[in-house]
């Protein structure tokens, strides 16, 4: 028999038709003279009815069926009885009366139910990923991901972009995250690196004159094992020649508009709001602000400067800041114990503590309220904080970074707790005019805020000259933000050798090191490179957000776990002594199979 349609597409349009369906047994109900089977495929579930009246042979087959058996059936689509209609199912008004059935394959009892909202460990789900992927919510996520990629291809093709592949085996340029290294058998002692991004190759394609490039690119980063990260991920990559940052942003908005229309059926407004990096940090305490709700950071320096509260006074005297957020209705919703828990948590951002007051009709209450009882204090503070009676004021007093990180975190965490966020809203935002460099406290040196190929703002190029302070420079870079997540980022690139060498020098590269690692790029920039720029969007995160998930693993078919391993195939695994010998490699300190080195 040849399948005529998908089970999940059966509806009243098929009434009276004979259909052939193939799929998995989701559920079986035996009423003696009748057996009901819920048949599942990638499009959904339809109810099958087996009866002696329709076919004794088919009923005999149904009697053998169990969960996850793969079957093939043929039958007639009919209306359900009025009392059996199920409005929760797309197919809930109809059923299929079966007159022919065949078992294509049997199945052992699976280790978990093939349904949504299962309560099992992530490790078990990953070990049996091929079963996990049968669940409807997993199939929906990957369907959305597929819809995004189809829209991407359609949009870029319609706008004159070439889809060009770049290499997986390339040169290691150890900046930023660690590379995944691939030893060469032919050149023993030499290594390829898997690309962290197609960055340099797409720039070289602009130098080659292709003008507009895109690629759905696989990328690899050997990062520390923490957070919602994957060692391999996918990005929607683009690069253009002779366009301004605003023109590249316009193309990106057009792409996102098409994706939202095709995948979600939502018509979003363009152009998106634009906000400088400084404004984002000042107002929201984050370079990826969620603008679906208020509770913005407010500068309290003037309002609290004469109160005699040493914590605030010392911060201001040392060139720091005092800022606050007003939690609407928080005075009644947060106990001292809850606030103390937040106080302890924000120490991870470098905060020494958290000052707070509750706003009442009569003034302030709380640990620091005694410092703010003078005439005018109430009006000055509530006005500066945009607060009203019933609100909770949370203060941070420290450096710009500590204050921003602390209140930026609290703002988002509290908004989630109080359900202040419209989950149906898609708030896209451009954050522009980034610093060219940022200080990495972990390695105690200045690093590029994006990457070392980013063009400074025209008025800031002189900061890369000898005797100037390059850390004052801002960049022609831009990030696209969606609902508090960095969806992607890009920049105008440096297109002259002279300026690129100055950039490397600002990063403490010697000429020899720059030539060794990036000589091919520097040489290319000497050969008539056009002005160019581009952007990359994280496909995994985009699919995660559009599918309503909170972890990118839910929209990747075969992801790694938090230890960068893959329980289903047991990757990474040991290899044979012969394979190591072929590569002239010797493992001096092997670990056990289930013990990562980090």
Swiss-Prot record:
It is found in: Cytoplasm. It comes from the Bacteria. One of its GO terms (molecular function) is aspartate-tRNA ligase activity. It catalyses: tRNA(Asp) + L-aspartate + ATP = L-aspartyl-tRNA(Asp) + AMP + diphosphate. Disulfide bonds: none annotated. This is Aspartate--tRNA ligase. It holds the Pfam family GAD. InterPro entries: Aa-tRNA-synt_II (IPR004364), aa-tRNA-synth_II (IPR006195), aa-tRNA-synth_II/BPL/LPL (IPR045864), Asp-tRNA-ligase_1 (IPR004524), Asp-tRNA-ligase_1_N (IPR047089), Asp/Asn-tRNA-synth_IIb (IPR002312), AspRS_core (IPR047090), GAD-like_sf (IPR004115). The keyword Transmembrane does not apply. Belongs to the class-II aminoacyl-tRNA synthetase family. Type 1 subfamily. Catalyzes the attachment of L-aspartate to tRNA(Asp) in a two-step reaction: L-aspartate is first activated by ATP to form Asp-AMP and then transferred to the acceptor end of tRNA(Asp). Homodimer. Keywords: Aminoacyl-tRNA synthetase, ATP-binding, Cytoplasm, Ligase, Nucleotide-binding, Protein biosynthesis. Its main location: cytoplasm. Its EC number is 6.1.1.12. GO terms for biological process: aspartyl-tRNA aminoacylation.
């Amino acid at each position: 028999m040849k399948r005529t349609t998908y089970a999940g597409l059966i509806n009243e349009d098929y009434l009276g038709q004979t259909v052939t369906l193939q799929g998995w047994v989701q559920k079986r109900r035996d009423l003696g003279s009748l057996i009901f089977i819920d048949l599942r495929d990638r499009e959904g579930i339809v109810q099958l009815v087996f009866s002696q009246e329709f076919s004794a042979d088919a009923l005999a087959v149904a009697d053998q069926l169990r969960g996850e058996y793969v079957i093939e059936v043929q039958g007639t689509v009919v209306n359900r009885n009025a009392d059996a209609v199920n409005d929760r199912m797309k197919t809930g008004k109809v059923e299929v009366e079966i007159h022919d059935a065949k078992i294509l394959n049997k199945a052992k009892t699976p280790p978990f139910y093939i349904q949504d909202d299962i309560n099992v460990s992530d490790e078990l789900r990953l070990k049996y990923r091929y079963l996990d992927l049968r669940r409807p919510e997993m199939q929906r996520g990957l369907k959305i991901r597929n819809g995004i990629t189809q829209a991407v291809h359609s949009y870029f093709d319609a706008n004159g972009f070439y889809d060009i592949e770049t290499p997986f085996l390339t040169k290691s340029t150890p900046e930023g995250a660690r590379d995944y290294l691939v030893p060469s058998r032919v050149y023993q002692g030499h290594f390829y690196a898997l690309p962290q991004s197609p960055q340099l190759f797409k720039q070289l394609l602009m130098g080659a004159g292709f003008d507009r490039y895109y690629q759905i690119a696989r990328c690899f980063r050997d990062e520390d094992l923490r957070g919602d990260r994957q060692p391999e991920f996918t990005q929607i990559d683009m690069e253009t020649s002779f366009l301004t940052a605003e023109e590249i942003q316009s193309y990106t908005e057009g792409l996102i508009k098409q994706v939202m229309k095709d995948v979600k059926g939502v018509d979003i407004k363009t152009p998106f709001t634009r906000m400088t990096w400084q404004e984002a940090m000042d107002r929201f305490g984050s370079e990826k602000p969620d603008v679906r709700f208020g509770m913005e950071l407010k500068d309290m320096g003037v309002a609290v400067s004469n109160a005699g509260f040493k914590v605030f006074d010392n911060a201001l005297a040392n060139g720091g800041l005092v800022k606050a957020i007003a939690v609407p209705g928080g005075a009644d919703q947060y106990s001292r114990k809850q606030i103390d828990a937040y106080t302890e948590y924000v120490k991870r951002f470098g905060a020494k503590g958290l000052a707070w007051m509750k706003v009442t009709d009569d003034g302030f209450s709380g640990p620091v309220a005694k410092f703010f009882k003078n005439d005018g204090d109430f009006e000055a503070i509530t006005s500066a904080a945009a607060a009203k009676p019933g609100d909770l004021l949370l203060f941070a007093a420290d450096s710009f970074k500590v204050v921003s990180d602390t209140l930026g975190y609290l703002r988002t965490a509290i908004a989630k707790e109080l359900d202040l966020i419209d989950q149906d809203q898609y708030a896209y935002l451009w954050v522009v005019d980034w610093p060219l460099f940022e200080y990495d406290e972990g390695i105690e040196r200045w690093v590029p805020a994006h990457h070392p190929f980013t063009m400074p703002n025209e008025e800031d190029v002189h900061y890369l000259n000898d005797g100037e302070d390059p850390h004052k420079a801002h960049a022609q870079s831009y990030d696209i933000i969606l609902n508090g997540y960095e969806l992607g980022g890009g920049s105008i690139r440096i297109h002259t050798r002279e300026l690129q060498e100055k950039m490397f020098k600002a990063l403490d590269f010697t000429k020899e090191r720059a030539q060794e690692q990036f000589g091919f790029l520097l040489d290319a920039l000497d050969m008539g490179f056009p002005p160019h720029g581009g952007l990359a969007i994280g496909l995994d995160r985009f699919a995660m957000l559009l599918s309503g998930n909170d972890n990118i693993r839910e929209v990747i078919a075969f992801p790694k776990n938090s230890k960068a391993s893959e329980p289903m195939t047991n990757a990474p695994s040991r290899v044979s002594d012969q394979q190591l010998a072929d590569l002239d490699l010797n493992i001096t300190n092997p670990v056990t199979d289930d013990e990562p080195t980090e």
